[in-house]
Amino acid sequence: MELASPRLIRLDFEDLTAFERVNDQYRHMGIRFSGAIAIEPSNPGFRAKSGSTVLIPMGNLMSLSAYFDKPSCWAGAFVCSTRIVVLTAYDREGNFLGQTSTVANQPSLPDGQSESSPQQLELNRHGIAKVEFHSYVPFTLDDFFFALMP
C-alpha cells in the first residue's frame, strides 16, 4: 500500500494590491478567506515575514478566517502583534479541533513604540475545514501555509 503525501502550499500575498479585500483570490488553490484585507504596513513594528504585503482583519474586526475546499491536515501562518494572537481550527460541522496561540511580545523601543517579530502559529489536525486567527488588538498575517491530502 502506498501512502499519499500531502500537497504543501504557502501563500505570501505578494500578488495582492494594497487595500484589496481578500476572499476568493486563492480559490484555485482550494482556499478562501473571510474578513481579510491586504496591506503594506508602514509601521515597522508590524513588518512582514517575507515581502511587503500582509493580511489584516477588515474594519474593527479582530479576526480573520480561512476556509478549505478539501480538509487540511496542517495549517498556520506567521502573525505579528503586540498581544496574543490565537489560531483555532474547526471541522466541516464547526466542531472545535484545536487551538494554539502566540506569546505576548512587547519589547520597548527608545521612542516608546513597541515592535513585534513575526511568530509562527500552526496546528496539525486531521479534517481542518476552517481556521480562525483572533486577537484583541490589531495583528498582521503573512506566509499562510497549509497541507491538503490528494
How would you name each of these model-derived features?
Residues 1-150:
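Surface-exposed, well-ordered secondary-structure segments
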